[in-house]
Amino acid sequence: MDPAAITAEHAARVGASDPLLPAPGRLREGTRLSVDRGEAVTWFQHLPVGLAARTWEPARTHRLDVRLAGEDRAGTLGALLDQWLDLIKDTVAPGDTDSAAVVELPSRDTEAVSALVHRGFVPSSVLAVRQTGRGGQAGAPGVRIRAATADDLAVATELNLTVVRFDAPFGKITPRESTEEVLRNQLVFLLNQPEPLVWLAERDHRVVGIVHIQLPPVSDWAGRSVAAAAAGYLGCLGVVESERGGGIGAALAAHAHAVLDAAGLPVTLLHHALANPYSTPFWYSVGYRPLWTTWIRRPAFG
């Protein structure tokens, strides 16, 4: 089966499974792999010390992008994975927990994922999408939501850092020595924008939660993952441990969603750790659903 036919069948299938998926483009530059009804490209990403992205990704990542056709897509993906893992195994130190093999797939295109499970991959994170107007309950009474200011930088950074630390055991995020500075710099950037993008929740005059968002053009990097004219991105929502489950997160989400909807954005995107027992049920209760799922094997080789 020629590559163009594989890509066309792949695009038709994933498009039918989820209308919010963008049409798959041509495979990017990299090392090409092929089997009878499958095509893939692999590339290596190294994040040097000091780079902000090291908080969100392993330092050394081998990635695979696939196009699948035919009826036995699990078998096709399995054959591509075997080629790929055989290709990269001599480039990875066994047991290097700062290395990973990563495959991102449309969340609703599920038939082939058993091939990943059988090779030790786990679904670690999701890029979730919310269409405008969708949401859950308004949140608890007695919670004040206010825009953060430069005077709130320290408490906002600590709240954001708490979210990162809580998500770290689930496999994708890695707190580094530089993480606090990375988060602080991100908040400084957001706080310096002309419109409020960071909000704090207060209860009994105490800061108990944070949410921050990105609007276009800052959020355009995320918008490439969804079939929409424009997209906002919800970067962080966190509530102090003693207040979780009390409606503060819902109040923060409702406020952020009102701002995003008022901006005329058809969709909002966010990343969350799939195994997080708080974030997964919470986000889907306030209008999100999975769009892309990241499957990871970390370390890449044991």
List the predicted regions and their residue ranges:
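A short beta-loop-alpha structural element at the N-terminal edge
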Residues: 1-8, 144-159
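Conserved GNAT-fold acetyl-CoA-binding loop/helix
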Residues: 3-29, 167-186
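Conserved donor-binding loop and adjoining core beta-sheet/short helix segment
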Residues: 21-86, 208-230
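Short hydrophobic/aromatic beta-strand element in the GNAT-like acyltransferase core
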Residues: 29-33, 195-200, 210, 236
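Acyl-donor-binding surface of acyltransferase catalytic domains
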Residues: 69-142, 292-300
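Conserved acetyl-CoA-binding loop-helix of GNAT-fold acetyltransferases
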Residues: 73-90, 236-239, 245-258, 262, ...
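Conserved hydrophobic beta-strand within the GNAT/NAT acetyltransferase core sheet
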Residues: 101-103, 234, 268-272
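Conserved active-site alpha-helix within GNAT-family acetyltransferase domains
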Residues: 107-123, 250, 262, 273-292
